From Swiss-Prot:
Keywords: ATP-binding, Cytoplasm, Glycolysis, Kinase, Nucleotide-binding, Transferase. It catalyses: D-glucose + ATP = D-glucose 6-phosphate + ADP + H(+). Its main location: cytoplasm. The gene is glk. GO terms for molecular function: ATP binding; D-glucose binding; glucokinase activity. This is Glucokinase.
Length: 337
């Protein structure tokens, strides 16, 4: 691997996996060094700093700069992963790694920044609305981004005259809005367990299990302990309840993605990312996702013109962190050690 003279360590840290790579901020169109990517289970390390040390030792590279995208809320010097017990302190981590500069950003800030360098080969169109390609330097665009994985990430990207401004949100934690009698019953069942039910309780890996458990309770069945992959495998084998679960997941996903467009004013398109999208892509394409996405009453005709695009780039979080490293001066809230 040929590393640049001053590489930046970029990381995409979720509730399950920690992904690391190197970025060359001098490269405009492709700042991520793809052959540098490594992935580790977060459970294998007591802290993010130790995971990063392991990566740098493994590849034999020294650097003093980093951009870490965290699947959780970033509050000044501290970031908490929503679905994992790691608490990340910027100054402590920077000192542990010997960094001069360390940026902590929300993972969907990174996902949003990646949009600016995605090409047609990196996305698959869902529905008939087409994505309008454009020269970034002349663009004025509003995009939404949503992605189910261990949790549900939501963000956006505003582009003005070639400058990219990511929108950091915790939109996965807004209340789930049921739209059918079946969804109302599911909400009632999940409310007994969780009290308040957010979109993330349904549209995520654990959400697949929650939907299946609720449908099983409606049918008077005890399904026993199941993992998300067990349910998707059963659906692939034709199991009726598992198939209902995946179809309902896709339909609700479409409905809340359409809501995101209306809330953010993401009139130029919405990007679907996260670990579940590639795995469920065929189901999303052949489900009621677009129907529920577009079915917004008096705005249905407008929604029909808005593209929804599944991101198939293998590492959009790392790519976006690399773009952030390249464009730090354009992004508010620079964090330095």
């Amino acid at each position: 691997m040929n590393a640049p003279q001053a590489p930046v360590l970029v990381a995409d840290i979720g509730g399950t996996n920690a992904r690391f790579a190197l970025a060359n901020p001098t490269l405009t169109s492709a700042p991520l060094l793809n052959d540098s990517m490594r992935e580790f289970a977060v459970i294998e390390f007591p802290s993010l700093g130790e995971a990063a040390q392991h990566y740098l030792h493994h590849i034999g590279i020294h650097t003093t700069k980093g951009v870490f995208a965290i699947a959780g809320h970033v509050d000044g010097d501290e970031a908490r992963i929503t679905n994992h017990p790691w608490v990340i302190t910027r100054t402590r981590t920077a000192t542990m790694l010997g960094f001069d500069t360390l940026h902590l950003i929300n993972d969907f800030v990174a996902q949003a920044m990646a949009i600016s360098v995605l090409g047609p080969q990196d996305v698959i169109q869902i529905g008939s609305a087409k994505w309008e390609q454009f020269p970034l330097s002349a663009a004025t665009r509003n995009y939404g981004i949503i992605g189910p994985g261990t949790g549900l990430g939501v963000g956006g990207l505003v582009i003005r005259n070639g400058r990219c401004y990511p929108l950091e949100t915790e939109g996965g934690h807004v209340s789930f809005p049921p739209s059918t009698p079946e969804e109302i019953r599911i909400l009632e069942i999940l409310s007994q367990q969780f009290g308040r039910v957010s979109n993330e309780r349904l549209i995520s890996g654990p959400g697949i299990v929650n939907i299946h458990r609720a449908l099983s309770e409606i049918d008077g069945i005890d399904p026993g302990p199941l993992r998300p992959q067990d349910i998707t495998m059963r659906a692939a084998d034709g199991d009726i309840r598992a198939t209902r679960t995946i179809n309902l997941f896709c339909n609700i996903f479409g409905a809340i993605t359409g809501d995101l467009v209306l809330i953010q004013g993401a009139w130029d398109g919405v990007f679907l990312t996260g670990g579940l999208v590639p795995k469920l892509l065929n189901s999303i394409q052949h489900s009621g996702f677009r129907q529920r996405f577009e079915h917004k009453g008096r705005f249905s005709a407008i929604m029909a013109r808005i593209p929804s695009l599944a991101v198939i780039h293998p590492h959009p979080g790392l790519l976006g962190a690399a773009v952030y490293a390249r464009d730090t001066e354009q992004v508010p809230q620079e964090i330095k050690a």
